[in-house]
Amino acid sequence: MFAAYGQDHEVAHYVTWRPHTCISDNEVVIGRFLDLWRDGCAFHWLLFQYSGSELMGAIGVRREAHRLELGYVLTRRYWGYGFMTEAVTVVVDWAFTEPSVFRVGAVVDIDNQRSVRLLERAGFEREGLLRSWAVHPNISATPRDCYSYSKIRNI
């Protein structure tokens, strides 16, 4: 994680965490992911290259009642090839096999056009503008406007 994307300032530009400065930052994140998985509160997966063991990124969902909130990060080297769109589609399909999940949502900074396009290609619909919604510390200490996206399970 550290070498693949954790320390990359461009990858971390729109996320809500600062780039990692040492391996122990990754150990803390992995520990938190494992605790959340055990508690059933969130599920995170690391994404690896098809033909090898190179880490490409990560994707996760956080459970909130009848819905899941989606988040993802991808190593810059793999931007623009559709890998994350594929991962999002797989995770959403998995989520909708859970009887209690009716909605998968995502929030994206209004300037993050790559994520906007990704979510729309994956079938998410923009629901609206969330004013001063999230602090992206690599951009500003002031909360920034974000778009809310969702995909609803067909009932």
Label each PLM-derived region with a short phrase.
Residues 10-32, 43-45:
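Conserved GNAT-fold acetyl-CoA-binding loop/helix
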Residues 22-24, 37, 138:
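A short hydrophobic/aromatic micro-motif that marks alpha-helical segments and, especially, helix-coil
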Residues 35-41:
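Short loop/turn motifs at secondary-structure junctions and domain boundaries
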Residues 34-35, 135:
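Short beta-turn/strand-loop junction motif enriched in small, turn-promoting residues
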Residues 4-9, 13, 46-155:
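Acyl-donor (CoA/ACP) binding surface of acyl/acetyltransferases
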